[in-house]
Amino acid sequence: VPVKNGSVRCEIFEPSASPLAPFDGVDVPLAPAVVKEQDPAVILYTSGTTGRPKGATLSHANILSNARSCVKVFGFTAEDVIFGGLPLFHAFGQTVSMNAAFAACATVALLPRFTPDHALSLIEAARVSVLAAVPSMYISLAALMAEQPERCAHLRGTVRFGISGGSALPAPVHEAWKELADCTVYEGYGLSETSPVVSFNQAAFGMVLGSVGRVLPGVQVQVRDSAGVERPTGESGQLWVRG
């Protein structure tokens, strides 16, 4: 949990968790690292676009820009508690669950390993206000809530909305979350190479089923042919992204 004075507070919601070991060097001053905006920050390995794993190198500017855009689009605040059930080595979890949350001074409620019951218990205990998850998580959580409707009361009025990516979320799952938890799940599009968020449905414009929404601030998108020439509106082609 980042706080405004630059320190970090850690809250543990799992009673059986082992205590954290003390860090004796916490008061030792460290020389600041000299980092340029375009210096590599992370290399995320992905096979999403080619089928074979490759490293996508993202700069500090890439990551910071995408995190700040997510804060603006989703309206994260320091009062939010973000569900941290996605792996943080994955672009979605790293940017939306962690980096954007830190940029907003929000809290991240971490879940070491996803199971529907453990996830729902964490959402209840930590009073999670924003869900960030992939469709399989939303599907399994909706199924559990349908079986145990008494647990839905904890989500109504606490969870503001959900964020979904990775693949399309079926319309019946959208409807189930709205009915069970009064929660709108917004879908978007991205890939590891783009830090990762390119576009998203946004509360300001409403959720359009079957759509990946509007392009994020600071991102430009064009549809071009195989020769790199821009295609007219309504024509198919390759999606070119920069930001």
Predicted regions, residues:
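AMP-binding/adenylate-forming core of the ANL superfamily
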Residues: 222, 233-243
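Conserved S/T- and glycine-rich ATP-binding loop of Class I adenylate-forming
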Residues: 40, 46-49, 82, 88, ...
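ANL superfamily adenylate-forming
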Residues: 2-37, 145-147
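Gly/Ser/Thr-rich phosphate-binding loop
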Residues: 128-133, 142-207, 220, 227-230
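Conserved AMP-binding/adenylation subdomain of ANL enzymes
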Residues: 64-81, 89-130, 140, 144-148
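Conserved AMP-binding A3 loop
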Residues: 41-65
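Conserved pre-ATP/AMP-binding loop-to-beta segment of ANL
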Residues: 26-45, 52, 75-81
